[in-house]
From Swiss-Prot:
It catalyses: ATP + H2O = ADP + phosphate + H(+). It comes from Saccharolobus shibatae (strain ATCC 51178 / DSM 5389 / JCM 8931 / NBRC 15437 / B12). GO terms for cellular component: cytoplasm. This is Thermosome subunit gamma. Keywords: ATP-binding, Chaperone, Cytoplasm, Hydrolase, Nucleotide-binding.
Amino acid sequence: MAYLLREGTQRSTGNEVILNNIAVAKILLEMLKSSLGPKGLDKMLVEGQDITITNDGATIVKNMEVQHPTAKLLIETAKTVDTEVGDGTTSVVVLAGLLLEKAEDLLNQKIHPTVIIEGYRKALSSSLELLKSIADKISPEDRKIVHDLVYTTLSSKFFSTEHTLEKIINLVIEASLAVLDKRDGTYDLDIKNIKIVKVNGGEFDDSELVNGIVVDKEPTNENMPKRAENVKVMLADFPLKLEKTEISMKLGISDPTQIKGYLDEQTAYVKQMVDKIKAMGVKLFITQKDIDEVASYLMGKSGIIALKNVKRSDIELLSRATGAKIASSMKDANESDLGEAKLVEVRNLGKNKYLFIQSDKAKAVTVIIKGSNNMVTDEAERSLNDAFNSIRNLLLEPYIVAGGGAVEEELAKRLRENAGKVPGKEQLAFNAFADALEEYVSILSETAGMDPISALTEIRHKHANGLKNAGIDIVKARIYDNMLELKVIDSLKVKEQVLKSATEAATAILKIDDMIAAAPAKQQPQPQQPNPYLG
């Protein structure tokens, strides 16, 4: 081994490696479990002068700069869950940590890691089957169900009053309906078609939905109209100016009048482009590139509103909002590529001016969120993204389960009932999986300020008596018989993803029995430079 590995390389093997990795997972579990659920506590994330206060799992894990490879694996798992379903990031790290904590007890009983892994995999397979039987199929067109799902998602956020929460819920639902694509009985919600604009100043109650796109730009010339109705829209990916050639050239000027002639030619070139835009009936011209002063002046004189240097993402949203195609050159532009806007208007939002481009048929919309400061509006944006994702998940898989730990407790109960069918020592791991799910419920009750032992005893009793939807009423810190009545519901898709990802992460860590930490490469000594001040 001394000749195989570089000098200074460290190696550890066997259960020592597994137990060390489990210890790292338990540290992450301790860090995140207090943020679980609607009453979860916030974390303050500090990076230089930037401060973020949040209980959003995705934000917490994205800002954690961990060094240990096991911690990195768990963080990447959480990020994957966030990408797939947009929710459940805290849950997946907590559940993976609990599975590894239970595995540690089995390892101490001399149960082999392979046996534990196989038991966990069988428990996962059984859990996914049981989830389908526990879940209720719903119609995506049932607005009450959609409302309750968004309510559950946003109830863990910091919206101060029930009135504000209801306003934000309705805003989320209306925005989703505006961009919803229904084909052959299936639904598709592309969240990229919903733009969120954050404005400092005002209250959440002042937030609004705009059927169209709001761009943080002003018209390029002060003489341009500040408002126009029923306008034709042109979107461009080319500049309105005389472009520089790739080849450097010099002009020889022998007469001052030649300068004027050269400038007149430039103006004529730009005027030709503006005249074509005007001839097509365009009243709003937006480009991703630059517009020079001459073009701005000429368009202002012609009553055309123009924006320059607009972000590509906004151009694409405007295309979906107005129906305009993006022209790549003036030569290719034609009237059939134009879109329409019912209203174009410059408005003040906070301390800045924005251009509102609205259309009744817009397939892209803007949600304007107002709050007292950046931290508040940033957290509100994260909350809205979670809510939009919850609706998307429901449309992809129209099944719901009761929240508040109800589905985890019911799964734990049914897994224990089926454990007798699992042969050998794998049965111990199968039961440990159920214990981890129940421990998850215990943590949820603790974040609600309840005594976890009393809460777990009561919820077990209710599920044993057939109340499959009994869970933790976080608001009143009690166990309630039917969480669906309290509008506390979760998407089946999120629960499935959390179970799969947590189990995969836990089993991946349990499979590692050898860790080799390579020594850092020795740096070659730099040759000394002669001192010019010495002889």
